[in-house]
């Protein structure tokens, strides 16, 4: 499952669980982007987003987190993500899960022509998005039936944008994301409207309940 995860929330986790059940996936690998090339806003540090994703997924044995995008230099492109995952799991059949709104801009992705050769794509609906296949595939020509699937996920009424705005205005984040992520956001002072003093990420700072 690819994404910025800034921050990760229950909508992401429910979407991953639902898609895993729908397609009988052995595991869901969360891949936080390193340097998202399409984002027009400030994105939190990659290590913060990675650690929040680890915290959020730790209790589910079906979930894991990969650093392939974070550890790769330069902007994050989905093509490179899928090629790296193939190299690490050469015998696995890959399903790439992402927001349906992201799939709508697929033609602007670098190397989009090769993407459908690398994985089955699953687009999950996000808040306010009208889920219509033709929005995504109208200019791509004919695709195999299993190349792209769109899935409605009601829990995606939760959005990372709203979570960031709530944190900026000191509004509660409880029940929108796992408790450990709420505590991590607070301890690291992420998304604050006015930046506070820097807090280093250390094992000690994560040992007070922020990390399972």
UniProtKB/Swiss-Prot annotation:
UniProt GO BP: NAD biosynthetic process
Family listed: Belongs to the NadD family.
Pfam short name (any one): CTP_transf_like
Function: Catalyzes the reversible adenylation of nicotinate mononucleotide (NaMN) to nicotinic acid adenine dinucleotide (NaAD).
Reactions catalysed: nicotinate beta-D-ribonucleotide + ATP + H(+) = deamido-NAD(+) + diphosphate
Pathway(s) annotated for this protein in UniProt: Cofactor biosynthesis; NAD(+) biosynthesis; deamido-NAD(+) from nicotinate D-ribonucleotide: step 1/1
Family annotation (InterPro entries): Cyt_trans-like, NadD/NMNAT, Rossmann-like_a/b/a_fold
EC numbers: 2.7.7.18
Keywords: ATP-binding, NAD, Nucleotide-binding, Nucleotidyltransferase, Pyridine nucleotide biosynthesis, Transferase
Any GO MF annotation of the entry: ATP binding
Gene, per the UniProt record: nadD
SUPFAM superfamilies recorded: Nucleotidylyl transferase
The name this protein goes by in its record: Probable nicotinate-nucleotide adenylyltransferase
């Amino acid at each position: 499952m690819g994404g910025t995860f800034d921050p990760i929330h229950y909508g992401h986790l429910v979407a991953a669980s639902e898609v895993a059940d729908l397609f009988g996936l052995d595991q869901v690998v969360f891949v936080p982007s390193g340097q998202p090339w399409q984002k027009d806003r400030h994105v939190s540090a990659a290590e913060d987003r990675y650690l929040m994703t680890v915290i959020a997924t730790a209790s589910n044995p079906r979930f894991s987190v990969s650093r392939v995008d974070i550890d790769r230099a330069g902007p994050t492109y989905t093509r490179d993500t899928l090629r790296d995952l193939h190299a690490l799991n050469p015998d696995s059949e890959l399903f790439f899960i992402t927001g349906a709104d992201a799939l709508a801009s697929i033609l602007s992705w670098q190397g989009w022509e090769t993407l459908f050769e690398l994985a089955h794509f699953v687009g999950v609906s996000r808040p306010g998005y009208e889920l219509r296949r033709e929005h995504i595939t109208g200019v791509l020509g004919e695709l195999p039936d299993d190349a792209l699937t769109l899935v409605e996920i009601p829990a995606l009424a939760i959005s990372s944008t709203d979570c960031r705005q709530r944190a900026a205005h000191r509004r509660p984040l409880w029940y929108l994301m796992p408790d450990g992520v709420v505590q991590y956001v607070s301890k690291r002072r992420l998304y604050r409207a006015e930046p506070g003093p820097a807090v280093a990420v250390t094992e000690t700072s994560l040992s007070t309940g922020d990390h399972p």
